[in-house]
Every structure is written in structure tokens, then in C-alpha cells.
Design a protein with these regions (language model features):
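Extracellular/periplasmic ectodomains of large secreted or surface enzymes and adhesion receptors
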Residues: 1-58, 64-110, 191, 251-252, ...
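A short acidic, Gly/Pro-enriched loop at the edge of an enzyme's catalytic core
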Residues: 501-510
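Conserved SAM-binding strand-loop segment of SAM-dependent methyltransferases
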Residues: 487-499
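A short glycine-rich, Lys/Arg-flanked "PGG" loop and its adjoining helix->strand segment in the class I
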Residues: 520-535
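Repeat-blade elements of multi-bladed beta-propeller folds
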Residues: 1-3, 69-73, 109-135, 149-176, ...
Length: 801
């Protein structure tokens, strides 16, 4: 029986829901979340209507000053329309070159953070950055930096400004309110259940990043936290002045309903995109799916559904066209952008409905300006444009902000500084030896209040991303600024407030304790985060207390030049490798409940690629040449393979040759010229496209105590599933698994698409779910790779049984 108390939705043989409760938790009926058609009724997307509506948008909302641009695309409708009066002759006043931003995802349907999105309040321009986790205020007249503030993670969405304040959210799970004049923090709200962290898009962030971009109306700020529905998502309304919570919806993560191809499974919101207010509706974009609609006043979920037919690509962008009569300034027609909501299916490019180019244009007075047409003498691809304070601001994808206004003076040009990497100061021999044994790709952590000079020197000796922990929050800000001045912050080094105790498990190739020697409890806590297969916890031998290795499974003690290393030399006890060929993988560490360890879409695989092999903490994957070989596919044969890509199963990091030598010697090398089969199926699956229902043995029914065949809900998925021994994994609408050791029921990992090939594999102590999405356009809301790790039994996880 599942001792971790999952919420259960019980189904009969026909898949019909019946009432059930787990503990005292209320079970909401499916009817509450059936698509109401409200969202569909809002989507009137004809391009001709857009032209008609845009002519009406010169009248601004009563709540906004025409001289400001207080939020992304001007207002809560995200209309990108202003009646700002610009000089007849526009001259370049200044240009500031910032680092180009790297979006969180490769997939353009999730490019909500591809470039800078400034906002303007009075004489100040504010720009957020995911490059160095900062919010910067600039003088609109001169382009000079007035102040800069650093958050605890990337800031991926534009701030909101008004009433002398700036509001923004970060991937650290915190919403900030600061003084617009000097950046002083007025209040913060940790909008998430705990300080638990994971690796998300290559950075250490909260499990619940703020990726529902904030929007403001009538003194209330709305935003959303969390991107994994099965981890919990939270949609908020707070008082802008104080941060006091007015309402919070935390029930939108576990919704049993339709998925692509009419599958039924647990799913829910994946808030990624800018929130929109349309009359009494709060629109919450959901990544590469379609948006959800909430009641603005109460926070009740009114509508959310995934496109059931499949092949209907959604995306992050949503905005509103105002009513045809121009009188209702707060309600209009929700519009999407068909250039955002498109993707390459295996056989063709597929576009969903929407207004082409809606995201890439603004309207100033009676003139629509399309970014593709260029602006003045701006070089590069225009990403964003706005008008405020009698000026036009143009932002390019390469990171340059241009300000145009009325002036004959020579423009001020602030070029990005080019930093010479100086030879780093030497490290102590014992620490240098430990670092030399820690590999080149991945993460290292430094705990114990390191200084900026030490971090600069340390980073000069390694290619690993450095995670530095400092217990003094004020010092964190200072060190971030000092490292940013050296162009090291964010991309090479992250400074986090804390003692390192909330580091995720297994991610660090080296953890260095700078403050003497850790006690037994600290060793135990930090050792959990040390990577298997050679990772180490390192500290000075001076005044070292006795270390009980019995508390540290698999640990070995090593000494070098005055330093001690506790090394996790081999595999995790109980973990298994998976070498393919449909062998069992009874990994004793992979058991329900499971939570996200990392997610990233750097490596994308074709949907019918072969299973990866997993050995010594490394996943070896082969893509198919589906684009290059498309015209050659015939007779049940498919495409050729590309060379193997090697990734770290504990971080998702792509690994080079020096970190994978042992694996390359062992794993087979397929013939890259051989045409591959269309499908890869286990011997138990006879029909490639219509698998039989899973029947992996018998069980004792936890509801009635009787022995019976082990059956459980499995919805659509040409992957019929595979019994790895302890876990049966499959695609059941989403990636899913059934833990046989606990009779867990079917647990959906909602968000990504698992492969046509079974690609949900327990091995090396984690549940591996590589990205098997290329060639598919269905609206799975979060197409990415991820790994999951076992969580405490108190962790909430819903299942269908």
C-alpha cells in the first residue's frame, strides 16, 4: 500500500471516475474542470479584426499614465498600444550594449525570455536580466545606470512599475517590491512552499520559479509560481502596496482530463508566459500549451484544457484586442500568435490559429510598427520596442538598447566592456588536486561564506559552474555585484543565500567547505549532494573532527596536502545501470514518491529514437536524422542515427570526452549508415501501434486486501510500457509509471512527452526521462528532458488507481 498518502482518483475498467479520498484530502470531481468553452469563445483571431481593433487602441486605460510604459506591452491587456507623442524627428540619444540573453528553452514556443523587455516609469527605464539575475534602473535621458539589484536567481520576465515602485519575480521563487528611486527592497514574498531547489535550464533555482509574468491592475499584483503541475503550481493575487495575499489558487496542478490524442491523465497548469487581464478574467499562459482562465476576483479556475486532437501547437504568447466599440477599455478578444504557435511536425510545418506577427509589433499613435521592418539605423534583429517619456526605445536580440528622442547632441554610447581573463591566483595544492579529479562539465559548490576574490580565483581553475553559498544576505548582494563587474556572475558563478543544506542530491562534482571542517551532521547533509562515481566533499584537515563513514553510504576517505576528501567513489548503493536490450533495471532507489531533480531541453531527440543507455552516471543517446533523411524513409524503415550524445544523468549537462572515457569504452557503437527500424519495442509488445493493456503480475489490492492481476489505468500511448522490475513505465497520456513495490497506482509526470519508444527509465538512482519530442507538435505544455529522485514519504503525489 502507498504509505506516502497519494491523492487517489479511482477508475473502473472503463476509466470512469468515482469518488475517493486519501486521508482528509478533498477529491475534486472531474466535472469541475471540464473545458467550458470559455477560452475558445475568447479566441477570435482573424487578422482583419486585428486591424479594426488596433485603430481603436489609441485611448489608454484610465489607470495608466500615457507617458509611462509600466509593464510588458504597455498594459494589463498586453496590447502594445500607446498614444505617446513622439518628436517629429527622432535622433539617437544613447545606446547601451548588454550581454545577449540565452532563453531558458531552445523551443521557440517557449521563448518568453529571448531578449530584454524594458519598462518605463517617469524618467527611469528598468530592465531585468536572466544573464546576471539583475534588475537595473537607467536614466531615460542619458542611459546612465542609476542602480542595480540582484535577485537569488534569473529574472526572466519584465518588471511592473507604478506608484514609485517596481515589482518583479525571479526563478528563486520570490516576488520583490523595490523603491523605483533607489532600488531599496520594500517587501518580498516567498511564493512557494519551501526552499527546495533543483537545476532548471542550467541554473540552480527554486522548484517553483516565478514564470507567470506579473501583471498589475487597481493596486493588485497577479503572478504565478511553479512550472511542474505535479510539484504544485500557485496563482496569486496580492496587494501591490504590502504584498499581502488576497487569494492564492493552489489547486490547478492536479486536473484529470484530456491530453493530446484524446488521452486522459492527470495534468495541470504549467505557468510560463506573461499573465493577461481581460475584463474579469485572468489569463495564464501555459508554456507550449494553450492558456488557462481564472476568475480575477476569486482566483477560481474557469477553464483549462489541452487540445485533445493532437498536433495543435500552443505557445507562451497571449494578448487582448479591445472591444469593437472602443468603450470597454478592460475587455476584448484574446489573441495568440500563429508565428509563435507553430512547430515542425515530422512531415511538415504546422501552425495553429492566431494573428501572424502579433507579438512582433507595437502601435504608437496611429502607426503600427513591425519589428521585421527595422527602425532607423538600428543594426541587428529587433526584439522589442516601446514608447514612453517622449522617446522611443528599441531593443535588439544581441542585447543593445537604443533610445531615440529630440536632440542634436552627440549620442552617448555605452559599449559592453571586454574583460581579459587574468591568470588566477594559485589554490592550495590539496584543493587543486581535488578539483583536478572533479571533471570538466557540471557543477561545484562552495560552502562557508567564500569571498569574491576567492571565487574569482577558484573559477579560473575550473570549467565547472560554481555555486557559492553565503549566510549573510547583504554580503551576497555585494559579492554578486563584484563578480558581475568581472562578467563572471550568472554564467560562471552563482551566489546563493544559505548554508548549502538545500542543495539537490547528487549534483555536485566537488563540494568545498571553506570554513574549517564540517561536523558530522553537516558532512551527512552535504554528502547527499555529492555526485556518485567520483564526486567529493573536500575540506582542510586542520582541527578535523572524527568522521563516521557509516553515516555516509559508499564513502571513502582520502588525504592530500593538508586536505581531506570524502569521496563517493562508485555507484549509489542499490542503483543499477541500464544497457538497453529491454533488460530489467531494478533500481532500489527509484521509488514513489518522486520529485524533479533537474530539467533542461539542451539535448532534443526525435520521438522514435532508440532507447538511451545509462552507465556510471552517463546517458548515451542517439538522435535520428529525421530532417536530413526524410525523403529516404520508406518500407517500414526509418532514419539513420547520429553519433552519441553523452549527458550527466544527475544534472542534464552535456559531457565531453574527458568525462566519458570509461563509458565510451564499454558502450557499443552503432553503424551510423544503417537505416533504423521505425519503432523499438520490447518483446512483450506485439502490435507497434495498439499495445495490449499492461499485466505485470499480481498484487494484493490495497483497497480490499484480495490478490488479483496487477492492472492499472493506461491511456493513449503507442509505447505500451515496459516492466523494469520494480517500476512499470509507459506513456499514458503523459510520461507515467507504476511503482510495483508500493502498488502506487499510475502516477503521471505531466508536462513533457515521453517517446514512442519507451523512454522512462529507472537507472543510476534516478528516473530518467530524456527529451523525445522532436517531430511532434502536440501541445504537451513542457517539452523538456528531466530526471526525478525519490522524495520523503510525506511528499504529495497524485495517482489514478
Amino acid at each position: 500500500m502507498c504509505v506516502f498518502k497519494p491523492h487517489l482518483a479511482v477508475f473502473d475498467a472503463q476509466g470512469q471516475a468515482s469518488e475517493s479520498k486519501a486521508g482528509d484530502s478533498e477529491v475534486y470531481q472531474r466535472e469541475m474542470y471540464e473545458p467550458s468553452g470559455r477560452l475558445r469563445s475568447l479566441l477570435r483571431l482573424e487578422p482583419l479584426r486585428m486591424i479594426v481593433y488596433l485603430t481603436l487602441l489609441a485611448i489608454q486605460s484610465r489607470t495608466l499614465d500615457a507617458g509611462d510604459w509600466p509593464m510588458w506591452r504597455k498594459d494589463e491587456l498586453r496590447s502594445a498600444v500607446t498614444d505617446e507623442v513622439l518628436p517629429e524627428t527622432l535622433s539617437l540619444l544613447w545606446r547601451r550594449d548588454l550581454p545577449a540573453l540565452t532563453p531558458a528553452y531552445r523551443n521557440a514556443r517557449l521563448h518568453f525570455d529571448r531578449g530584454y523587455e524594458p519598462v518605463v516609469l517617469e524618467k527611469r527605464l528598468f530592465v531585468a536580466s536572466s544573464h546576471n539575475d539583475s534588475l537595473t534602473a537607467m536614466d531615460t535621458e542619458t542611459g546612465k545606470v542609476l542602480w542595480r539589484l540582484y535577485a537569488g536567481g534569473p529574472i526572466r520576465f519584465a518588471p511592473v512599475v507604478g506608484d514609485g515602485k517596481v515589482w518583479f519575480g525571479s526563478d528563486d521563487g520570490v516576488v520583490y517590491c523595490v523603491n523605483a528611486s533607489d532600488g531599496k527592497v520594500l517587501w518580498t514574498l516567498r511564493a512557494v512552499p519551501s526552499k527546495r531547489m533543483l537545476l532548471g535550464n542550467g541554473r540552480l533555482i527554486s522548484v517553483w520559479p516565478i514564470r507567470g509574468g506579473p501583471v498589475l491592475r487597481d493596486g493588485r499584483l497577479y503572478f504565478a509560481a511553479g512550472v511542474w503541475s505535479f510539484e504544485g503550481v500557485f496563482v496569486y493575487c496580492v496587494e501591490a502596496e504590502s504584498g499581502k495575499v488576497i487569494w492564492r489558487n493552489d489547486r490547478a496542478g492536479y486536473i484529470y482530463g484530456k491530453h493530446p490524442h484524446n488521452a486522459e491523465a492527470f495534468g495541470g497548469l504549467t505557468p510560463q508566459g506573461y499573465l493577461v487581464i481581460n475584463g474579469d478574467d485572468l489569463i495564464v499562459p501555459c508554456g507550449s500549451a494553450l492558456p488557462a482562465t481564472f476568475d480575477l476576483k476569486s482566483g477560481r479556475l474557469n477553464d483549462f484544457s489541452l487540445p485533445a486532437p493532437g498536433r495543435d501547437p500552443g505557445g507562451w504568447f497571449a494578448s487582448v484586442l479591445r472591444s469593437e466599440d472602443g468603450q470597454n477599455l478592460r475587455r476584448g478578444t484574446l489573441t495568440l500568435d500563429s508565428e509563435v504557435n507553430q512547430d515542425r511536425h515530422e512531415d511538415r510545418q504546422i501552425k495553429n490559429t492566431g494573428t501572424p506577427g502579433a507579438r512582433n509589433s507595437v502601435r504608437i499613435q496611429d502607426k503600427t510598427i513591425r519589428f521585421a521592418d527595422g527602425f532607423r539605423n538600428v543594426k541587428g534583429t529587433i526584439h522589442s520596442m516601446l514608447a514612453a517619456d517622449g522617446k522611443a526605445f528599441v531593443v535588439t536580440l544581441d542585447g543593445s538598447i537604443h533610445c531615440f528622442g529630440d536632440s542634436t547632441a552627440e549620442p552617448a554610447i555605452y559599449e559592453r566592456k571586454k574583460y581579459e581573463i587574468s591568470k588566477p591566483e594559485s589554490l592550495p595544492d590539496g584543493l587543486k588536486q581535488a578539483l583536478d579529479h572533479s571533471g570538466r562539465n557540471g557543477f561545484t559548490a562552495i560552502v562557508g561564506n567564500p569571498s569574491s576574490p576567492f571565487l574569482e580565483s577558484f573559477a579560473g581553475h575550473t570549467e565547472l559552474h560554481v555555486l557559492a553559498f553565503h549566510t549573510d544576505e547583504t554580503q551576497c548582494g555585494k559579492i554578486r555585484g563584484q563578480l558581475d563587474d568581472l562578467d563572471l556572475y550568472g554564467t560562471r558563478i552563482s551566489v546563493l543565500h544559505g548554508d548549502g543544506s538545500n542543495l539537490p542530491p547528487y549534483i555536485a562534482r566537488l563540494i568545498y567547505w571553506t570554513d574549517g571542517s564540517p561536523d558530522q551532521e553537516a558532512c551527512k547533509t552535504l554528502f547527499r549532494s555529492v555526485r556518485p562515481y567520483g564526486g567529493r566533499l573536500c575540506f582542510t584537515a586542520k582541527n578535523r573532527p572524527g568522521i563516521n563513514l557509516g553515516d555516509l553510504p559508499g564513502a571513502e576517505l582520502r588525504h592530500a596536502a593538508g586536505f581531506v576528501s570524502i569521496v563517493r567513489a562508485g555507484a549509489l548503493p542499490g542503483a543499477t545501470d541500464y544497457l538497453g536490450d529491454w533488460a530489467k533495471s531494478r533500481d532500489a532507489l527509484v521509488k514513489a514518491p518522486l520529485g524533479v531533480l533537474w530539467f533542461d531541453d539542451t539535448v532534443g531527440l526525435f520521438k522514435r529514437s532508440p532507447q538511451p543507455r545509462i552507465l556510471n552516471g552517463v546517458m548515451a543517446s542517439h538522435k535520428k536524422r529525421w530532417i536530413e533523411d526524410f525523403d529516404k524513409r520508406a518500407g517500414g524503415k526509418d532514419y539513420r542515427l547520429t553519433p552519441a550524445i553523452y549527458t550527466d544523468v544527475y544534472t542534464g549537462t552535456v559531457l565531453g570526452e574527458s568525462d566519458t572515457e570509461d563509458v565510451r569504452k564499454v558502450l557499443p557503437k552503432p553503424d551510423l549508415e544503417e537505416v533504423q527500424p521505425s519503432q523499438y519495442r520490447p518483446p512483450s509488445q506485439i502490435d507497434h501501434w495498439a499495445p495490449d493493456a499492461p499485466q505485470p503480475g499480481t498484487r494484493v489490492n490495497p483497497l480490499n486486501g484480495k490478490e488479483e492481476p496487477r492492472r492499472f489505468p493506461k491511456s493513449y500511448g503507442c509505447d505500451g510500457g515496459f516492466d523494469y522490475g520494480n517500476l512499470f513505465t509507459m506513456r499514458s497520456g503523459t510520461a507515467a509509471f507504476y511503482d510495483k513495490t508500493q502498488e502506487s497506482g499510475t502516477i503521471n509526470i505531466s508536462g513533457p512527452r515521453s517517446g514512442c519508444t519507451n523512454s522512462v527509465i529507472p537507472a543510476n538512482g534516478v528516473l530518467n526521462i530524456p527529451y523525445f519530442y522532436e517531430g511532434c507538435t502536440c501541445s504537451y505544455p513542457l517539452p523538456t528532458a528531466l530526471a526525478l529522485v525519490s522524495m520523503p514519504q510525506t511528499f504529495e503525489q497524485w495517482a489514478s488507481w
